[in-house]
Structures are given as structure tokens and as C-alpha cells.
């Protein structure tokens, strides 16, 4: 049975500081530790990102970054607990040696198809991984129009989120 993460803070759910701290205390009381995963896109009850900066991306969206130190500071100040945070995108960039074979196959196929599309003159598309039907994992690469991807977001279905809003449920894990 999976143990961690114990709390997952999702952008689909408004961050509730009190609920977050109470859940953290409860998990620590039970297990002696608590692992938290947080999206940079989580917002407070005023609709502001917890980690928003003044910098904007190419689409005019707020540049995010800093939710981990924000939560770390909150836990330190409110719960008086030592804690550690890490930004996982650094791990992805520096740990190719522990990538799964599937990840490597996906990366190579996406890159090869991007080159193939460019050489053949396809514009306004990007390669995407399309999962096959059935229990056995199969996949293929297809072109997708950038107009259906760029500057859009796909939200996690509410049916995948626990009632307390602090994790994903079995349906999310199994799908």
C-alpha cells in the first residue's frame, strides 16, 4: 500500500491553510513524518497564487515558483517543526540515469516525430503521446494542433480528488 505523499495540494482546490496544517499535524501524529506534494498553481481564497511573482511568461501568465519555501515557512512558523523542501523539476533535469525505460522511449519517440514533422513541413502541431485502449499499456505518437494545447489548461477531474481536497483518490491512481 502506498504511504506517501500524504498531502497533495492541487490547483483545482483553493488552499485552506487551517485544513492543511491540521492534516499535517494529524499525519505526523500517526506516522512521525509527512510528505507533501504541492502544485505551483495553488491559490488562496482570494484567487491569488501562493507563489506568484511579478514576472510574466510568453502568454502573459504569472511566473510561478516559490510554493515550497512558502509552505516550509508556514510549517516552521505555525507548527514549529523542522522541515525540508525540494523542487522536483531539478530532479527531472539531473537524473536521466534513473529514468524509466518507458520515459526514455517516450522522449525519443516525441523528439523523432517532432523532427519528422518539421522536415515534412508540418506547422502548428506538436507530437503527443496517445495511450491505447485496454489493460495492457500501449501508446503511439500523433500530431496535435497547437491551437488545442498552447495557452490552455486541462484540469484534474473533481472525481479524482479526495473529499477533504488534500489528495487524490483510488480512482485517480487506477486510471
Regions found by a protein language model. Name each.
Residues 52-175:
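C-terminal non-catalytic interaction/assembly regions of soluble proteins
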Residues 1-84:
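Accessory alpha-helical/coil subdomains and C-terminal extensions
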Amino acid at each position: 500500500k502506498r504511504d506517501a505523499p500524504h498531502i497533495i495540494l492541487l490547483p483545482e482546490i483553493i488552499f485552506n491553510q487551517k485544513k492543511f496544517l491540521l492534516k499535517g499535524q494529524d499525519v505526523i501524529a500517526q506516522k512521525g513524518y509527512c510528505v507533501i506534494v504541492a502544485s505551483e498553481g495553488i491559490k488562496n481564497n482570494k484567487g491569488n497564487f501562493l507563489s506568484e511573482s511579478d514576472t510574466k511568461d510568453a502568454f502573459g501568465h504569472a511566473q510561478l515558483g516559490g510554493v515550497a519555501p512558502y509552505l516550509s515557512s508556514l510549517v516552521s512558523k505555525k507548527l514549529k517543526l523542522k522541515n525540508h523542501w525540494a523542487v522536483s523539476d531539478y530532479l527531472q533535469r539531473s537524473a536521466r540515469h534513473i529514468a524509466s525505460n518507458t520515459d526514455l522511449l517516450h522522449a525519443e519517440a516525441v523528439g523523432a516525430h517532432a523532427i519528422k514533422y518539421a522536415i515534412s513541413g508540418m506547422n502548428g502541431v506538436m507530437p503527443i503521446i496517445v495511450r491505447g485502449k485496454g489493460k495492457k499499456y500501449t501508446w503511439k505518437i500523433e500530431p496535435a494542433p497547437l491551437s488545442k494545447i498552447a495557452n490552455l489548461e486541462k484540469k484534474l477531474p473533481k472525481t479524482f480528488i479526495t473529499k477533504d481536497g488534500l489528495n487524490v483518490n483510488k480512482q485517480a491512481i487506477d486510471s
